[in-house]
Amino acid sequence: MLKKNDSVVILSGKDKGKKGEIKEVIASKNRVIVSGVNIVSKHEKPAGNKKGGIIKVEAPLHISNVAIVCKKCNKAMTPKHTVANDGAKVRVCRKCGETVK
């Protein structure tokens, strides 16, 4: 499960290997927007007091094309969901056992 502010790495596409943080999760479409990744040019018409022109925006990526990066071992991982001692559900790195926030 991906959450906002998770540190992720891109697994496929033109930005393969780049790292960034999740800015937004679009759960209904299984997509995420990652900061600084998948930049596309968008043509906007002027409307009201807003200028028109070509602007750069971050486009959504499918969740299958990103993986969470463990801060301790610095590798892409799929987290394991476990219950902590205090009863809270936590995500844990399968490789090193570090808790992912």
UniProtKB/Swiss-Prot annotation:
Signal peptide positions (record): none
Keyword terms of this UniProt record: Ribonucleoprotein, Ribosomal protein, RNA-binding, rRNA-binding
Segments passing through the bilayer: none
UniProt cross-references to Pfam families, sorted A to Z: KOW (PF00467), ribosomal_L24 (PF17136)
Highest rank taxon of the organism: Bacteria
SUPFAM superfamilies listed in its UniProt record: Translation proteins SH3-like domain
GO biological process: translation
InterPro entries on file: KOW, Rib_uL2_dom2, Ribosomal_uL24, Ribosomal_uL24_CS, Ribosomal_uL24_KOW, Translation_prot_SH3-like_sf
Gene Ontology molecular functions: rRNA binding; structural constituent of ribosome
Gene3D superfamilies (UniProt xref): 2.30.30.30
Gene Ontology annotations for the cellular component aspect, listed alphabetically: ribonucleoprotein complex; ribosome
PANTHER family given in the database record: MITOCHONDRIAL RIBOSOMAL PROTEIN L24
Chain's role: One of two assembly initiator proteins, it binds directly to the 5'-end of the 23S rRNA, where it nucleates assembly of the 50S subunit. One of the proteins that surrounds the polypeptide exit tunnel on the outside of the subunit.
Assigned protein family: Belongs to the universal ribosomal protein uL24 family.
Subunit comment: Part of the 50S ribosomal subunit.
Official protein name in the record: Large ribosomal subunit protein uL24
Gene: rplX
